[in-house]
Amino acid sequence: LFLEVFLIHLCSVSNKNLGQQAAAYFHHQFIVNAAPSWKEGTISDLGTVIGGSTPSKSKPEYYTDNGIAWITPKDLSVDKSKFISHGADDITELGLRNSSASIMPAGTVLFSSRAPIGYIAIADGEVTTNQGFKSVVPNGNVGTAFVYYFLKNALPTIENMASGSTFKEISGSAMRTVPAVIPD
């Protein structure tokens, strides 16, 4: 048992280190040494920014155990992996229709926009999110991995663009204007 726990810990540390190396490599290759042909633009040039929504909690018929995946920032705080397919709750078709939640495709980069700003994961299937997200559905000209690492790299800029008195939040309109390097 001790050996199993030790190996799990070792894998966790190794995965964290690999993630840090990938982020550093991205910054060096695609931000510091971006190709001269790449243009300056905004996140909107990388993909479509989509907000989330919460169906009324007073309507139990809007929630189910095996429905449409519905992700909250809390889900990303508990599951710190790069990919996510389900959170603690799912919503029903009725809940989806009676809210402004949208189904986003696999490969969407989920980005928590408040409380806290900056939890990031990639949808490993179709998902919806609550209003604590400004997610990016990558355009065809850039890949999911590029958007994922771009958002990780842009986190300080995004945090500086956030506003709010009780807690900081980045609005959808502000998120769309975050400066970005656009690959050709």
Question: Could you describe each region identified by the protein language model?
Answer:
Residues S44-G47, Y148, L155, P179:
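Generic hydrophobic alpha-helical scaffold/packing signal
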Residues L1-H9, K134-T144, G172-D184:
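Proline-centric
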Residues W38-K82, G95-S100, S163:
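Low-complexity, Lys/Gly-biased intrinsically disordered segments
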Residues T72-P73, A88-K152, A162, S171:
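A short beta-sheet element
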Residues F2-T54, V181-D184:
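Non-catalytic DNA-recognition/assembly elements of restriction-modification systems
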Residues N153-A180:
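Specificity-determining recognition surfaces
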Residues K59-E61, G87-D90:
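Short Gly/aromatic-enriched secondary-structure transition segments
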